[in-house]
Swiss-Prot record:
It comes from Hydra vulgaris. This is Arminin 7519. Expressed in entodermal epithelium along the body column. It is found in: Secreted; Target cell membrane. It comes from the Eukaryota. Belongs to the arminin family. Keywords: Amidation, Antibiotic, Antimicrobial, Immunity, Innate immunity, Membrane, Secreted, Signal, Target cell membrane, Target membrane.
Length: 89
């Protein structure tokens, strides 16, 4: 009789555990997905920070020239060329 009760008790535990196992498995899966999404979000922030640092790592002279755009300088080019030509004469 004791062995029969032991087998039935173990079967009951096994059935209970199998239902809980599926729930636990789903919870773990959801937690892992959330962790992955959070890590990806943090990685995106780190990549943006690194890109900004790479721009700021330029030499001071290069940073000075990066500020100037062609549209700002282009209207003055004919005058600069004329002045340069006049200086050669």
């Amino acid at each position: 009789m004791r062995s029969t009760f032991a087998v039935l008790f173990l079967a009951l535990i096994a059935l209970t555990y199998s239902k809980n196992y599926q729930d636990v498995k789903e919870e773990i899966k959801n937690e892992v997905e959330n962790e992955i999404l959070r890590d990806l979000g943090e990685d995106d922030d780190e990549l943006d920070d690194n890109a900004q640092e790479a721009v700021n790592d330029a030499r001071p002279l290069r940073r000075f020239f990066r500020k100037f755009r062609g549209r700002k300088i282009l209207p003055y080019m004919p005058s600069l060329i004329n002045i340069w030509k006049a200086g050669k004469k």
